[in-house]
Amino acid sequence: MSMLRLYTRVLELLGKEARLGWILAGANLLLAGAQFAEPVLFGRIVDVLSGSPAAGPFGMTSTSPWPLLAVWVVFGLFTILCGVIVALQADRLSHRQRQAVLTGYFEHIMQLPLTYHAGTHSGRLMKVMLQGTDALWRLWLGFFREHFAAMMSLVVLLPLSLTINWRLAILLFALCIVFTMLTTLVVRRTFDMQNEVEAHFSDLSARASDALGNVALVQSFVRVDAEVQGLRFVVDKLLAAQMPVLSWWAVVTVMTRASTTITILAIFAVGIVLNQRGMTSVGEIVMFVSFATMLIQRLEQVVSFINSVFMEAPRLKEFFNVLDAVPAVRDRPDAIDAGRLQGLVEFHDVSFSYDGKRPAVEDLSFVALPGQTIALVGPTGAGKSTAVALLHRAFDPQSGIIKIDGMDIRGLTLASLRRNIGVVFQEALLFDRSIAENLRVGKPDASEEEMRLAASRAQALGFIERADRKFDTHAGERGRMLSGGERQRLSIARALLKDPPILILDEATSALDAVTEAKVNAALDEVMKGRTTFVIAHRLSTIRNATRILVFENGRVIENGTFDELLARGGHFARLAKAQFMTQDGSRIGQPS
């Protein structure tokens, strides 16, 4: 992405603030004109004081400095007032839009597929969000407060200076050319270097976030020194990449200062010669020295702006790369909200592949009637989780169709579909909030009585009541203030509180002890009545009462039947059952464990 295209996208993100942006641009143009008038008036006053008549206001010749001074005061007051208004509005625009873009970015990444999040470190996404929106804020603020006015000053000053004295104006053009050449040279030399610097920043953020997320592991294995040393290594590489960039921009600063001094001396030298030949006045020499001083300030602001865009470019590229990531599924324009569904689920020749090469699910077909419990078993990677992910549209199949109550799920809004499906994940997912807030994820308006009932059914009420703050107890980051079994029971209670017609249990009882598991299974047996339930299971003892069992292998269903039917066939499921029962408790096949 070119620098011009990059900055165009920065301005496009102004969105609803674009109208105010245009108003600020017009105000900056007026400011540029007013600021140009001040050196002109200064020069004319010098001419008057030195005994030469000068052009006064409204085209009149003035022999008194007072009218010129009065006009200067008017322009000065206008510049101050307009500058204050522009600065205030630029500040407000930048802050408002930063928060709007940050919110939009957050909403966007929350809609990206789980495969994207699995391959992208959460610390990197946070770093891209914060650094990207901060970069946008700095560029918007600088552009509308200073940099655009500086550019407009160049547009106004250079052409008008030619109309006053083209010989002295040539020196100003020469100064601009030198600035442009130096800036272009350094940008080209350091562009790749700055990209490398930002890559090291990303590594630094990811490594620090990774270590902090596994602090228990670091302390347990006495890895503090090793992790600190690893971080220092990344910091050293970052500094090694950063120093050459800083050196090049330091050279630009020195060279521009030198060219500035040379230009002012040249204006005096050429001005003296022209004055001696009667081709310019003392006032015009002073005027062009003021022009040069103003031009230098504006050029430095423009270079600062270019430097800002250049320095922020890698961060903004990362930011736009995330924004350009496409969600796996979207609502169709004609998608409907079907309300509460009955739970009749149909898969018809459904196939899906993550990489377009190896199918994760292939030609999957089955029907689950309302109230039935369908168990999905098989080795890791066989396609069980992919099948249920397709059901709640984490992805859409490449071929085939999935229906609920006879409707293609792609014709339902995502919100409508997912309101009708409750999921209990194998790893309990909790927010760093209170137990009540975590439970209300399932039903935002749930009363305390409803939460107590759901917690009781999930065998979670006991430990909640024992806590000092009951339902206001803080769960901690990822629920770390609770045990694994407690986290999982809250996850089950949350799904029960949601009360969906379709329930997905992904090894929902795997984190529970035997006694609690038995109680939760009894509660789940009761709550699954009247719901279509999909159970992903590795422990076959947990699915003995399933209506039907689908045995997966390499994305296909190789066996299909009840628990006893599959045992009687003596196939793949029977071998799994024999291996598990013999290793778990030594009971014979077919005997409840």
UniProtKB/Swiss-Prot annotation:
Entry's localization field: Cell inner membrane
Signal peptide: none
Single Gene Ontology MF annotation: ABC-type beta-glucan transporter activity
Assigned GO CC terms: plasma membrane
Transmembrane feature ranges: 22-42, 68-88, 146-166, 167-187, 254-274, 285-305
Enzyme class: translocase
Annotated PROSITE patterns: ABC_TM1F, ABC_TRANSPORTER_1, ABC_TRANSPORTER_2, NDVA
Membrane topology recorded in Swiss-Prot or TrEMBL: Multi-pass membrane protein
Keyword annotations of the record: ATP-binding, Cell inner membrane, Cell membrane, Membrane, Nucleotide-binding, Sugar transport, Translocase, Transmembrane, Transmembrane helix, Transport
Residues binding ATP, per UniProt: G378, P379, T380, G381, A382, G383, K384, S385
Domain ABC transmembrane type-1 span(s) in chain numbering: 21-311
Pfam families the UniProt entry points to: ABC_membrane, ABC_tran
Main subcellular localisation: membrane
Subunit structure: Homodimer.
PANTHER family the record matches: ATP-BINDING CASSETTE SUB-FAMILY B MEMBER 10, MITOCHONDRIAL, ATP-DEPENDENT PERMEASE MDL1, MITOCHONDRIAL
Record's comment describing the protein's domains: In NdvA the ATP-binding domain (NBD) and the transmembrane domain (TMD) are fused.
Protein name: Beta-(1-->2)glucan export ATP-binding/permease protein NdvA
Species annotation: Nitrobacter hamburgensis (strain DSM 10229 / NCIMB 13809 / X14)
Name of the encoding gene: ndvA
